[in-house]
Amino acid sequence: MSERVEAGQNVIKEYLVLTKPGIVSLVLITTLGGMYLGSRGELQPELVFWTLLGTGLAAAGSAVLNMVIDKDIDKLMVRTSERPLPKGTVDPTKAFIFGITLQVFSLVIMLTFVGVLPALLVALASFSYVILYSLLLKRKSPVATEIGGISGALPPVIGYVAASGSVDINAIALFLLMFMWQPPHFWVLALKYADDYKRAGIPTLPVARGVFITKLKTLLYTASLFPVSLIPYLTGLVENLYFVVAVVMNLIYLGLTLKFFFSKKEESMKLFFFSIIYLAVLFGTMIVDMVK
């Protein structure tokens, strides 16, 4: 009996791994942040619950479907070879059904309890990640990183629109900030795992264009983040504290990126981790310094 229980627990754990809990957590945090900004700090608990549930299920379902699509190349990469599908601990067909089921539940919840527009944005996020990125572009072009950024940029917009009821300049500002942040964040990681991606035949920017072009594009995107990150201040979403913090964080981020660009290093996890701190500080300051 205990062996059955243990086996059942192991199966649950493997299915949980398929949903990429770390990424789902980040999606939920940015969605909640968007809701707080969209509601001007006056969150409705019931709406928050349904929005986070619907968005979380969509993110989890997309992660599962991504793993189903990538099961063959995941076997070839050291970083992903221990995932459930490459290991054979979960049947691909069952995983596919699981992923689709999560997506269906997500759409029903969003349409029933949140609204048509947020539901459409959730569907767009899933489509851009599963179809555009995972299925069509990831194995063919380094542009996949930028296109795939659409899905990662939408969670705060989904939260903002769910709370405010419309897509306005502030929602667009949140989208642009997330969209411009993702490529340089990923490219630094892609440099570290370039051999893994090359072995699997994935044309990430370091594999397809080399280290110099990757470092150059990382620098260009980081520089572009500076003006983009100030849009929430210019639109009146936040006040002076955010402006000061954003300027300081951008100068540090740009300085670290310039240092990396001119160095002989081919990877920089320090820059990768700072990019996470950068985003967290900016979003945190937005919430603290929001105009109510």
UniProtKB/Swiss-Prot annotation:
Transmembrane segments: 15-35, 49-69, 104-124, 147-167, 171-191, 218-238, 242-262, 271-291
Subcellular location: Cell inner membrane
Topology versus the membrane: Multi-pass membrane protein
Superkingdom of origin: Bacteria
Additional detail: Carbon 2 of the heme B porphyrin ring is defined according to the Fischer nomenclature.
HAMAP family named among the record's database cross-references: CyoE_CtaB (MF_00154)
Protein name listed in UniProt: Protoheme IX farnesyltransferase
Organism: Aquifex aeolicus (strain VF5)
The organism's taxonomic lineage, starting at the top: Bacteria, Pseudomonadati, Aquificota, Aquificia, Aquificales
